[in-house]
């Protein structure tokens, strides 16, 4: 039976981590071994947004591995395709990760600066050609350190999706143009973390914060999804992952060890509800015909506005993909180049993909 270990931050992150690592039998596993820690640092934003891994947890994991005589401990990530090339290192420096790793006497690496392994015709569910960082395969132990989030394409983004950070930056959009849920499952057949530590440490959704841990990535993501207030069986990456033999999705067949999960349940807003709450005057059309080239920089820009407490003061219609029908709203904005036809009352932020900076700049004119 798969096991998932839960520990609240009652006294310190260090104590909670020590509990789940001990319960999972990790002390004997890391001794004398090389370890790669893979957090989620897709953008240079603070962990307090709930979008990137808490540097305090990264520090705790690095120190725990060092204290248990790991031969080498490295922290590595490959940020989002939509993070400008000049800002990639900022995903380490501006998030506080670089500082804590260096203080521990360890090393952080940007995958983009190192070698990649090329895959050709691996699966009909994957892009014909894509590249994975060699660092996914160089270490004895891979510790996956995701942040639990909702996502407009996969509903949730936890451990399974966090492995996309190993892809070469230019190849990441290819996974979105394919069926992303199936592609993520196929990627998880290639890269296998030794343990997954889900970072629920920010108090954004729970009063105390906690850690969920497990070696079964589907089981760990399934329990985490349930704790987010969502049904694992409604998440395609989890149902497909279970069917592919990657792990257990049935909560009745997963042993939860440690904290009582009933006291940890939260309510994460799905993207549609989040948009209605923060931008009630916003209408988005054509999103079902748009790829991530438009949707990722758009939702990232909207998140940035929401975090600043900003909203639109009058109705605004955003048109994506091949949507070209006219809008009754006094303000209309087209995103991307998919549709050659632009209604008379619309602005356009063009490009394939369009610039996040330009999208944010244009949206800011309407708040």
Feature annotation, model-predicted:
Residues 1-367:
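N-terminal and secondary-structure boundary signal
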